[in-house]
């Protein structure tokens, strides 16, 4: 019987959900759901000083907003798999550490941070390109070892075999192999008693029966270390896949310090982007469907997801493309959903026409709210210039002769066009500016109608 596919997203509660983390979570979610498997949310919260209050809830809430709902989490645990927060598993990690020490597969390393720095320095001077820990470097007396041991002034390192290749067939990149001599014995428990990332994540993945690990390429260097830990315990390792980085449009890796680009899901949520659009957009950051389709629903993406189509090249975060996605979804959003979000005091008929008109070009709810202000707080003074007042006079003359409806406003525009033989910008701009006091906007007849007859006539009378 085939094992159930189980993937996981395991962030640290150190801040808001970043675009990169959201993309990783999404691919893990799609991978699991495509195979009728389970997607697990787990928390790596042992770095107490960096943890942010509310960080866990923020991560889960933003994932839920996107439509990424885990099958298991700290809030929805499966008792079979134990705790879902690393901070609640310290005794378990310690027991596994003790087991490795007992078997001679790990040992106490008594180096102080200053002594390690000196070893680093000596290797650099000797031309060693990348630091390898040398367990024979530190020379201590028996009494000093005893003192440091009693004071718990030590870390625990995994003892690696010499000249051993750790290899895996990466889901994204194909075969990768790293030799143990290029790694060196590495720390699996820090001197503060907390396990390192590489150790805790192996224990967690093993205990939770994780079958596939999809994560960013920055973890490639961690994988051979994790394989060494799996081997030390005699456990089967999951299948690994390392996603390419996300860059800005200049090809530079996204930096959280770059304020020119919104990089946190919370920002898009607050501005009123369609979550389905962000879900769709993120799925195409490093993956393409076999039929090249771009607009795909949640269920379509699950059905079509194929890890073989994950990109081997970096993905550019194109904000213009994301805006386009959001506009496509905004057009399809039911008017009543938008009306509920914009808190308009106008009547139902007006609200429906307003939303139907303005959602055609809007990427966010915030944009629609801004446009609503044009009608709720209309400008009292025209601050724009027009080139041809004859167009305005002619338009108003035709408009006054009819009932004030969208169809008749459009008819007055068309009659002005025919009477004066003007078209395009020369026709529309004078009318738009004088009737709406705006230079840009949606379909002109509807934009004018939404202001109401009294205000439009008051504005145009000045030109008659």
From Swiss-Prot:
One of its GO terms (cellular component) is cytosol. It is found in: Cytoplasm. It is an enzyme of class 6 (ligase). Coiled coil: none annotated. It catalyses: tRNA(Glu) + L-glutamate + ATP = L-glutamyl-tRNA(Glu) + AMP + diphosphate. SUPFAM superfamilies: An anticodon-binding domain of class I aminoacyl-tRNA synthetases, Nucleotidylyl transferase. Its EC number is 6.1.1.17. It holds the Pfam family Anticodon_2. One of its GO terms (biological process) is glutamyl-tRNA aminoacylation. A motif ('HIGH' region) lies at residues 11-21. One of its GO terms (molecular function) is tRNA binding. Keywords: Aminoacyl-tRNA synthetase, ATP-binding, Cytoplasm, Ligase, Nucleotide-binding, Protein biosynthesis. InterPro entries: aa-tRNA-synth_I_cd-bd (IPR045462), aa-tRNA-synth_I_codon-bd_sub2 (IPR020751), aa-tRNA-synth_I_CS (IPR001412), aa_tRNA-synth_I_cd-bd_sf (IPR008925), Glu-tRNA-ligase_bac/mito (IPR004527), Glu/Gln-tRNA-synth (IPR000924), Glu/Gln-tRNA-synth_Ib_cat-dom (IPR020058), GluQ/Sye (IPR049940). ATP binds at residue 256. A motif ('KMSKS' region) lies at residues 253-257. Belongs to the class-I aminoacyl-tRNA synthetase family. Glutamate--tRNA ligase type 1 subfamily. Catalyzes the attachment of glutamate to tRNA(Glu) in a two-step reaction: glutamate is first activated by ATP to form Glu-AMP and then transferred to the acceptor end of tRNA(Glu). Monomer. This is Glutamate--tRNA ligase.
């Amino acid at each position: 019987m085939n094992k159930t596919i189980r993937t996981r997203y395991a962030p640290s509660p150190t801040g808001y959900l970043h675009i990169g983390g959201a993309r990783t979570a999404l691919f893990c979610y799609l991978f699991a759901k495509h195979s009728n498997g389970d997607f697990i949310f787990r928390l790596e919260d042992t770095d107490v000083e960096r943890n942010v209050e509310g960080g866990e809830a923020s991560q889960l809430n933003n994932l839920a907003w996107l439509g990424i709902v885990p099958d298991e989490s700290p809030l929805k645990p499966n008792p079979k798999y134990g705790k879902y927060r690393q901070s609640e598993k310290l005794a378990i990690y310690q027991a596994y550490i003790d087991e490795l020490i007992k078997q001679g597969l790990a040992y106490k390393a008594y180096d102080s941070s200053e002594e390690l720095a000196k070893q680093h320095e000596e290797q650099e001077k000797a031309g060693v390109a990348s630091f390898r820990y040398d367990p024979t470097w530190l020379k201590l007396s028996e009494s000093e070892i005893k003192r440091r041991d009693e004071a718990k002034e030590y870390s625990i390192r995994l003892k690696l075999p010499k000249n051993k290749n750790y290899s895996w067939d990466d889901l994204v990149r194909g075969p990768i192999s790293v030799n143990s001599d290029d790694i060196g014995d590495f720390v699996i428990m820090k001197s503060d008693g907390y396990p390192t990332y590489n150790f805790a994540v192996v224990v967690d993945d093993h205990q939770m029966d994780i079958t596939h690990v999809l994560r960013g390429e920055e973890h490639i260097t961690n994988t051979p270390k994790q394989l060494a830990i799996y081997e030390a315990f005699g456990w089967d390792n999951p299948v690994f896949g390392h996603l390419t980085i996300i860059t800005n449009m200049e090809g530079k890796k996204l930096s959280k310090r770059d304020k020119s680009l919104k990089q946190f899901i919370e920002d898009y949520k607050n501005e009123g982007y369609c979550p389905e659009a962000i879900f769709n957009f993120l799925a195409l950051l490093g993956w393409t469907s076999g039929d090249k389709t771009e607009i795909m629903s949640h269920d379509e993406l699950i059905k079509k997801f194929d890890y073989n189509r994950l990109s081997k090249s970096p993905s550019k975060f194109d904000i213009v493309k994301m805006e386009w996605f959001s506009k496509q979804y905004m057009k399809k959003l039911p008017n009543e959903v938008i009306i509920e979000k914009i808190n308009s005091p106008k009547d139902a008929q007006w609200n429906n026409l307003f939303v139907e008109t303005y959602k055609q070009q809007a990427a966010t709810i915030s944009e629609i709210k801004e446009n609503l202000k044009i009608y709720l707080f209309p400008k009292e003074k025209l601050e724009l210039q027009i080139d041809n007042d004859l167009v305005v006079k002619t338009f108003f003359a035709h408009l006054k002769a009819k009932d004030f409806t969208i169809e008749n406003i459009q008819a007055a525009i068309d009659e002005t066009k025919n009477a004066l033989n003007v078209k395009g910008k020369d026709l529309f701009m004078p009318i738009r500016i004088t009737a709406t006091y705006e230079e840009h906007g949606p379909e002109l007849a509807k934009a004018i109608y939404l202001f109401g007859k009294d205000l439009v006539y008051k504005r145009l009378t000045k030109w008659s």
